[in-house]
Amino acid sequence: MKKKLLALLLGLTLCLSLAACGGSTDDTAADDTADTSGDDAAETVTLTVAASPTPHAVILEQCVPILAEQGIDLVINEYSDYVVPNTAVEDGDEDANYFQHIPYLEEFNETRGTHLVDVASVHIEPMGIYAGKTASLEELADGAVIAIPNDATNEGRALLLLEAQGLITLDDSSNLTATPNNIVDNPKNLEFQELEAATIPSVLADVDLAVINSNYALGAGLNPTTDALAIESSDSPYVNVLVVKEGNEDNEAVQALVEALHSDAIRDFITEEFDGAVVPAF
């Protein structure tokens, strides 16, 4: 009897020991799973890009799923001005920006002392002349008022477009930073309202004509290919670029975005979505 009781006690002890070991194994497996999950989360890289709403942010949205497949979370932050996106990249608040053309970038670096570089040419937005109170270029009266951007490069760009239409003559037709002071012939005595580029669509009803960047025209519901009275030629030097701070050109996430922006899928999207108002530059 004592032998049977001893055998029973030994059996119970063995079962409890095995159960305890089994519980420890399960806990360890759960811990391993949590650690693996943590490792997966740590592998996700966030890339922030400052962009104008249209077309830049619209184009970037198409890159989100492409980068997600590579473990990159593309965060697009929209800005409506031409200064903060650059200072944000310079200060490290944004990883990159996509809103500007090369002449503007070069002028910004020179005047602001920033260290920004372009890493990808993406598209061209032909600048256009739009009707305000005057319906056509032929009807433009003496002393008419024309709204133009007030930043150095886009102002020069607007004046070059007006010169191409025979409305004015500049002292140097290759001067990309021309101002009204560079006008040497103004047969219609045109007056120029120099305004922040983003605000120009809102003053169309108050001026005779307005020269508007295509991104702001699109944002205001205007189609550059059908609504503009005149538009830049396709050989425009104003290519819009992806920009980072100097030293970050080879960042893996940045290079992944460059590859996505230069893909056939993005080229086809730009061509189909904007119908000539935005032209791929790659």
Predicted regions and their residues:
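Sec-dependent N-terminal signal peptides of Gram-positive bacterial secreted proteins and lipoproteins
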Residues: K2-S24
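Bacterial lipoprotein signal-peptidase II cleavage site
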Residues: S17-A41
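Short, well-ordered beta-strand elements
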Residues: A42-T54, I72-E78, V145-I146
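Short helix-initiation/N-cap motifs at beta->coil->alpha
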Residues: I76-T87, N175-S202
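Ligand-binding "clamshell"
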Residues: E107-V119, K133-T134, D206, V211, ...
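A conserved helix-loop-strand patch within extracytoplasmic ligand-binding domains
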Residues: V119-I168, R267
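A bilobed periplasmic-binding-protein/Venus flytrap-type ligand-binding module shared by bacterial periplasmic
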Residues: P126-L137, V239-N251
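Periplasmic-binding protein-like
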Residues: N154-E163, L261-A281
